[in-house]
Amino acid sequence: MAHKKGASSSRNGRDSNAQRLGVKRFGGQVVKAGEIIVRQRGTHFHPGDGVGRGKDDTLFALQPGSVQFGTRRGRKVIDVVSVDA
């Protein structure tokens, strides 16, 4: 196999697809059970009351309610607080 590049060839031209990470529901927004709140790599945000964590560290609502961001013990935490109408 030749290891020299041929005429007008390139070793570039590849790129990976975006992972579409980030906050999907912001503070004060109303969510239903099962709705994704944050897609993340690692635990930038930790699950609080009414929030579950998937195996890829995705945070999702366990109950319907309003999303609240806060801190607990120096960690960023997300809670889902039930909305009593």
From Swiss-Prot:
<keyword id="KW-0689">Ribosomal protein</keyword>
<dbReference type="GO" id="GO:0006412">
    <property type="term" value="P:translation"/>
</dbReference>
<protein>
    <recommendedName>
        <fullName>Large ribosomal subunit protein bL27</fullName>
    </recommendedName>
</protein>
<dbReference type="InterPro" id="IPR001684">
    <property type="entry name" value="Ribosomal_bL27"/>
</dbReference>
<keyword id="KW-0687">Ribonucleoprotein</keyword>
<dbReference type="Pfam" id="PF01016">
    <property type="entry name" value="Ribosomal_L27"/>
</dbReference>
<feature type="compositionally biased region" description="Polar residues">
    <location>
        <begin position="7"/>
        <end position="19"/>
    </location>
</feature>
<comment type="similarity">
    <text>Belongs to the bacterial ribosomal protein bL27 family.</text>
</comment>
<dbReference type="InterPro" id="IPR018261">
    <property type="entry name" value="Ribosomal_bL27_CS"/>
</dbReference>
<dbReference type="GO" id="GO:0022625">
    <property type="term" value="C:cytosolic large ribosomal subunit"/>
</dbReference>
<dbReference type="GO" id="GO:0003735">
    <property type="term" value="F:structural constituent of ribosome"/>
</dbReference>
<feature type="region of interest" description="Disordered">
    <location>
        <begin position="1"/>
        <end position="21"/>
    </location>
</feature>
